[in-house]
Regions:
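Transmembrane-helix motifs of polytopic, lipid-linked glycan transferases
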Residues: 74-95, 128, 132-136, 325-329
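Loop-to-helix entry region of an early transmembrane alpha helix in multi-pass inner-membrane enzymes
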Residues: 45-60, 64-85, 104, 116, ...
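Membrane-interface anchor segments at the N-terminal boundary of transmembrane helices
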Residues: 71, 271, 278-344
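Short acidic/glycine- and proline-prone juxtamembrane loop motifs at membrane-interface regions
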Residues: 112, 118-125
Length: 397
């Protein structure tokens, strides 16, 4: 896929990236990191535009293979391979090794996952870090509260906070998982609430310690407490404005050019207030937008114009639709397995809700599909392998 993508772009001199805006920003920030320059792009400087997780990964790849696009794509392809392995680990931890292998195989043959893995976009990197954080949380949930497990509980609590923070550094929308994890951890620990609260504190401590460098750096450049980025406001307005359709269209940002008279922090506040004001005054349009965004999020094939070729639509749909059917069946046969359902369905529902407000597309669903494929693997296993085992047992008898 990396070879195909690079050859297609090489034949179109006017194009540098498959998806221009975000990819160009990530690439330029990575170059700034590699050269030891200020973490900012554009004029006037945008110092808190993106979380540094993915640019750091790109910069690391550049330091090994150089700044050529094809070499970096090959490194990102290896990250896609790593995603298969982490899905295997999570599936094995949640159910068994067979489920892990089936889920990893589904990920390996997914055209969308393979295709996005070689683009200069953060989806695959976030998927890997998100899956690792989910794996650590599952490991933590299985640690007993006895005295002999105190060290193990402490270790996995801190690791859970650290892994959540690493995923957050790639995609800031993962931030809300921390309070959700704390609530679930405490309320699921019947008879051990105090110990669970201690673990929750350690998780928050691990997360906070990881966040300190970014928050401190942002305070230095903005004189404000900024735990995420200063792009949330324009992103929110992109999804809630008079011309909004559910698709991203940031043309208003260039047309209005508010950075000419505002700081980056003031600009973020300005668009946040405008988006909230518009939502309050136009609930009907907001409700219709939610429907459009929900449709874009769950659409089996990509929404973007450049991906509307028949073979692309077919390649993505022929995998996604059956996988979703197996996931529904897997959810039914696992309806009493609350941890499994939480880890596999939780992320895809979580991002679906977030993108009822922000703009929506397959891109934002894709990272959550990785854990969902574990539920699909459960459905496949119960539909085929379980029945095969039962038939062999009957024949044996």
């Amino acid at each position: 896929v990396a070879v195909y993508v690079q050859r297609q772009l090489d034949q179109q001199p006017e194009r540098t990236y498959v998806i221009e805006g975000d990819a160009d920003g990530y690439w330029k920030l990575a170059q700034q990191i590699l050269r030891g320059e200020e973490y900012s792009i554009y004029t006037p400087p945008r110092r808190v535009l993106r979380m540094p997780g993915f640019p750091v990964l790109l910069a690391g790849a550049m330091s090994v293979v150089g700044e050529g696009h094809f070499g970096v794509r090959l490194v990102l392809a290896l990250l896609g391979v790593l995603a298969c392995y982490v899905v295997y680990l999570l599936g094995k931890e949640l159910v068994n090794e067979s489920i892990g292998l089936i889920a990893a195989a589904l990920v390996a043959v997914s055209p969308a996952m393979a295709g996005f893995s070689v683009l200069f976009l953060s989806e695959t990197a976030f998927a890997v870090t998100m899956l690792i954080s989910l794996w650590v949380l599952v490991k933590l949930s299985k640690v007993e509260y006895g005295a002999c497990d105190q060290f193990k509980g402490t270790l996995f609590s801190i690791l859970a906070g650290i892994s959540l923070a690493i995923a957050f550094y790639v995609r800031p929308s993962w931030l809300l998982i921390l309070p959700l994890a704390v609530v679930i951890l405490v309320f699921s620990a019947k008879g051990n609430r105090i110990a669970a609260m201690q673990r929750a504190f350690l998780m928050c401590l691990g997360f906070s310690m990881m966040l300190v460098p970014w928050v401190y750096r942002n305070y230095q450049v903005t004189n404000h407490f900024v735990p995420t980025t200063l792009w949330a406001g324009p992103s929110l307005y992109d999804g809630l404005n008079p011309q909004a359709t559910g698709d991203s269209n940031m043309i208003f940002f260039d047309q209005e050019n508010v950075l000419k008279t505002m700081s980056e922090y003031e600009m973020n506040q300005h668009y946040t207030k405008r988006a909230i004001k518009y939502a309050r005054e136009n609930p009907g349009h907001v409700f219709r937008l939610m429907g459009a965004k929900l449709l874009r999020y769950w659409k089996p094939w990509p929404n973007a114009v450049q991906f509307q070729k028949f073979w692309m639509i077919f390649a993505v749909s022929v995998i996604f639709i059956p996988v979703m059917c197996f996931a529904i069946y897997g959810a039914w046969v696992s309806r009493d397995q609350y941890l499994l359902l939480l880890i596999t369905l939780g992320p895809v529902i979580y991002f679906s809700l977030i993108h009822l407000i922000f703009v929506s597309s397959l891109r934002y669903r894709l990272p959550a599909e990785y854990s969902l494929y574990i539920l699909s693997a459960v459905g496949i296993y119960h539909m085929f392998f379980n029945r095969l085992t039962e038939k062999r047992s009957i024949l044996g008898q």
